Amino acid sequence: MFQVLDQLPADPILGLSAACRADTNPHKVDLTIGIYMDDSGVCPVFEAVRRAQQALDAEEVTKAYLPPAGDDVFNRGISELVLGRGSAALADGRVSSIQTPGGCGALRIGAEIIQAAAPGARVWVSDPTWPVHIPLLGSVGLQFESYRYYDPASHGVDFEGMVADLGRAAAGDVVLLHGCCHNPCGADLSPEQWAVVADMAERQGFT
C-alpha cells in the first residue's frame, strides 16, 4: 500500500535547523525553530512551567478523557483571555472554542469545517506564510489566493498591498490572519490596521 505514496519534500525550516546543528562555528545562533534554547542548545523546562505542572498534578482528580471540544473551563478561560471578559460576543453566546493538538491540528480542523460548510470558498494566505499552511489546508481540496504582507524594505507590514489584495476577497472567502507574531516574519498589524481589516471583512463578507 505505501509504495504508491510519493515521498514528501523535506521541511525547509527543519532542514535549516539540522544544518545549524552540523555547523561547527562556535558563535552560531539557531533562530530557525520557534523554541527557546540555552547556550548549550537545550530547550529547558522553565521553573515556572515546572511548578505549574506540579500544581496541576496535585489538583488532578481523574484521568477520564475529555469531551470532543476539550476542557470547558480552559475553553472559556482562553476565550476570555483573547476577547476580554466583557466581550459582547461572549455575552451573546456567539463564540465557540475547542482544544486542538497544536496549531497545525487547529488549522486542519478548520480546513475540514471550511470544506464541509463552504466548499467553493477560497482561502487567502499571507505572503510569506509558514510553509506547512498551504499543503495542510490544501489536503482537503481548498483553493488558495495570496495577499501581500511583508515589506522587506521596511521590515514591516506592506499594509497598502495587503488591503489592495484583500479588496479582491469575495463574500464567503476565508482569510488566514496571524493574531500576533506573524509566522515567519514577525511583523504584526497595529490596532488601527486590525480595525481596517475588520471593516473590510464586514463590508465584503469574508471570514
Task: Put a short name on every predicted segment.
Residues 55, 60-205:
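Conserved core of the PLP fold type I
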Residues 1-70, 77-80, 84:
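N-terminal "arm"/small-domain region of PLP-dependent enzymes with the aminotransferase-like
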